[in-house]
From Swiss-Prot:
Calcium-binding protein that interacts with rotavirus cell receptors once the initial attachment by VP4 has been achieved. Rotavirus attachment and entry into the host cell probably involves multiple sequential contacts between the outer capsid proteins VP4 and VP7, and the cell receptors. Following entry into the host cell, low intracellular or intravesicular Ca(2+) concentration probably causes the calcium-stabilized VP7 trimers to dissociate from the virion. This step is probably necessary for the membrane-disrupting entry step and the release of VP4, which is locked onto the virion by VP7. GO terms for cellular component: host cell endoplasmic reticulum lumen; T=13 icosahedral viral capsid; viral outer capsid. This is Outer capsid glycoprotein VP7. Glycans are attached at residues 69, 145. Belongs to the rotavirus VP7 family. Residues 253-255 are annotated as: GPR motif. Residues 237-239 are annotated as: LVD motif.
């Protein structure tokens, strides 16, 4: 009996000593690995000359678009400003160094060289199909064109607000808008939109669901269409899907890092009448039409007042981000 107890105690002591030895061995081994790893980290960096791809990107958001006057020297920048302008401005100025001149003028207003990026677009129609707003602050210059009033106002509504959008299958389903913030947004080379409102028996109201020629045409061959119909009523839609994509969208609120400046025009575009616009003070302003040199001088002169009406955001906007906001 006593022999069994002694054997048990002896076995326990041997197990304890063996476990203690194993733990000490593991501790010594881990200390060796950790200290060797730290030694390598401390010694190697001064000997290497590799690029750190994380510090030379002054623009927040997507970097898919190359910017004409980008620089990799200003790694300390905390804010970036993108200035969007039509191609006609470049043609009129006709000066290969005009961007450098404007950049130096922005420097006098506190914007370091390399923090201002110039982005050219062909026209309002093409810009509305694929808006790309990547900077902390984005200022879009739109020269007034009487024939493009609708495109200009809808583009302003698109880029001055954030939207959550989902695909629509108009061949299988009827759609209705739930409230005033719910819109259908179409983009493409040519968008013609027709709608047929339905009653509770899914019969057309003033139209035949089997005959699209009886549908109400709300847009014809446009690049960008924001369709607003009567809330709470199902609609059958007919869209030129071969050249246009339509999405079911919800306006979430203002995109406060974007401002639109209308250049010239007797009529002032104003989207603040939209009841879904909150707050009612929008970042949309107008300056008188002058030569493009004078336009850029005016923007430089008032850039800081313009920025004060905006808020810095890191979320970028392009056609993909517009469709699927994350």
């Amino acid at each position: 009996m006593y022999g069994i107890e002694y054997t048990t105690v002896l076995t326990f002591l041997i197990s304890f000593i063996l476990l203690n030895y194993i733990l000490k061995s593991l501790t010594i081994m881990m200390d060796f690995i950790i200290y060797r790893f730290l030694f390598i980290i401390v010694v190697l960096p001064p000997l290497l000359n590799a690029q750190n791809y994380g510090i030379n990107l002054p623009i927040t958001g997507s970097m898919d678009t190359a910017y004409a006057n980008s620089t990799q020297e200003e790694t300390f920048l905390t804010s970036t400003l993108c200035l969007y302008y039509p191609t006609e401005a470049v043609a009129e100025i006709n000066d290969n160094s005009w961007k450098d001149t404007i950049s130096q003028l922005f420097l006098t207003k506190g914007w370091p060289t390399g923090s201002v990026y110039f982005k050219e677009y062909t026209d309002i129609a093409s810009f509305s199909v694929d808006p790309q707003l990547y900077c902390d602050y984005n200022v879009v210059l739109m020269k007034y064109n009487e024939t493009l009033q609708l495109d200009m106002s809808e583009l302003a509504d698109l880029i001055l607000n954030e939207w959550l959008c989902n695909p629509m299958d108009i061949n299988l389903y009827y759609y209705q808008q739930t409230d005033e913030a719910n819109k259908w947004i179409s983009m493409g080379s040519s968008c013609t939109i027709k709608v047929c409102p339905l009653n509770t028996q899914t019969l057309g109201i003033g139209c035949l669901t089997t005959d699209t020629t009886t549908f109400e045409e709300v847009a014809t061959a446009e690049k960008l269409v924001i369709t607003d119909v009567v809330d709470g009523v199902n609609h059958k839609l007919d869209v030129t899907t071969s050249t246009c994509t339509i999405r079911n969208c919800k306006k979430l609120g203002p995109r406060e890092n974007v401002a639109v400046i209308q250049i010239g025009g007797s009529d002032i575009l104003d989207i603040t009448a939209d009841p879904t616009t909150a707050p009612q003070t929008e970042r949309m302003m107008r300056i008188n039409w002058k030569k493009w040199w004078q336009v850029f001088y005016t923007v430089v002169d008032y850039v800081n007042q313009i920025i004060q009406a905006m808020s810095k955001r890191s979320r970028s906007l392009n056609s993909a981000a517009f469709y699927y906001r994350v």
